[in-house]
């Protein structure tokens, strides 16, 4: 039996504020594109302003997938993303249309293209126990507990990073092995992605200062457009907490802190900008590890045209 040549699927990746949406919509104006979002914040409903979610007008240009698919009380894993994206890619291709992956959540992209490690699924009862321990002892104490069983993971986590500390402890308690050891093991091999050749086209800045200025301008625009009110409404639901993955999204945790009275407005704004820049830095580090990527300078005034050229050369 002869193996079929994998079908190329372009993936437009880049840090926040690099111009991905504009380039994707420009491609959609020229090709029958359906966009698959690669963004862990856009999956949440009721979180529009702080996630810079594509507008209704933008989403009318081309079908968008994996946006507004879960409630902020829920979580959405890299494993779910991989399964959904492989399914959607096949469905879009079968319709005779072009799947285009767009986003900046590099953990999702890595799971899609490199497979998944054998980490156990979340255990609600165990998490409740860990939450109760943390409420009694504090997260720094939980961090110390993690350091005793998985010093490698503990060394890269802040003592108040409740979400990741909880997950690392959960993995150890379920498997008896350190999460760092499980992640270092070879990813599980499967053939689910074998039909596709995912090719990253990366929007990266030749001048990081230009991107930082865009980030600052965009965060200020979010605040002007009602970001604080959006978080007020989320808090008023009564079923969300700052420890949930949705409320740990960049910007939301800083506004939540402001609404708690822990910081003033100016400090909240500065912390939000700083956190977004730190996210950008992490995204660029991921991108630069992808030696196979096609790079487009997002500072180039003709960046959108360069992206179109790069993607159309793949088709």
UniProtKB/Swiss-Prot annotation:
GO MF annotations, alphabetized: ATP binding; tRNA dimethylallyltransferase activity
Listed Pfam families: IPPT
InterPro entries: Dimethylallyltransferase, IPT, P-loop_NTPase
Keywords: ATP-binding, Magnesium, Nucleotide-binding, Transferase, tRNA processing
Disulfide cross-links: none
Domain of life assignment: Bacteria
Feature type site, description Interaction with substrate tRNA: 105, 127
Residues annotated as binding ATP: 14-21
EC number(s) per entry: 2.5.1.75
GO biological process terms, semicolon-separated: tRNA modification
Catalyzed reactions: adenosine(37) in tRNA + dimethylallyl diphosphate = N(6)-dimethylallyladenosine(37) in tRNA + diphosphate
Cofactor(s) this protein requires: Mg(2+)
Residues that hold substrate according to the record: 16-21
PANTHER family: TRNA DIMETHYLALLYLTRANSFERASE
Protein family according to the UniProt entry: Belongs to the IPP transferase family.
Quaternary organization: Monomer.
Protein name as it appears in the record: tRNA dimethylallyltransferase
Organism: Paraburkholderia xenovorans (strain LB400)
Gene (UniProt): miaA
